Amino acid sequence: MVRFENGIPRALFMSEHAGGQAFAWSALEKFQTRTADNETIERPVLYSAIGSHAMYAVPGNHPYVLPFGMLKDVTDRGPLWDPALNTYAYFYDYVADRDSGGTNLTSLTPAASNPEAPTSWFHFAGPWGDELYALRDMRQWRLFEQYHYITGPLGPKFKNLDRMNVCQTEHCTLLYSIEAGKKAVWYD
């Protein structure tokens, strides 16, 4: 989630399993690109975990839940992808959604740049991704009742999109450097 103030990006929250990290916009690694009008702009570089929904500010190993890096996400520099080149834009009326008890299926509307973009995905109330793999599945393992592969998270509609802070939860530290992010824990 990007937090804007007067149209200027100020902070970014990256989801990491049950938690995540929030960084000041100025702290993030950036790459320069050009718009269709040949304007130079900067976009943040995020690292997507292999086989996971988690996002990180740096490449490498990212342990979570279990000690000694036994359960970790792995990221690397991989191919650079600019999501702005193939993205859909939307407007979300969280007040209308909240007042209807979450049943207002018109609370998400496509932007003028993509008026035919689908919206039904947003209202899906189940978990995204795989279900918890059984222990008999050769990819699955557990230690101290913590499974390596678990059922995916709920979608963006259920991520407190009407929140005042950039983080999903009240407990949040806005980080002002990548180094501070390396020292922080995943559940901050």
Predicted stretch roles:
Residues 1-188:
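Domain-length functional cores that host ligand/cofactor binding and catalytic or interaction surfaces
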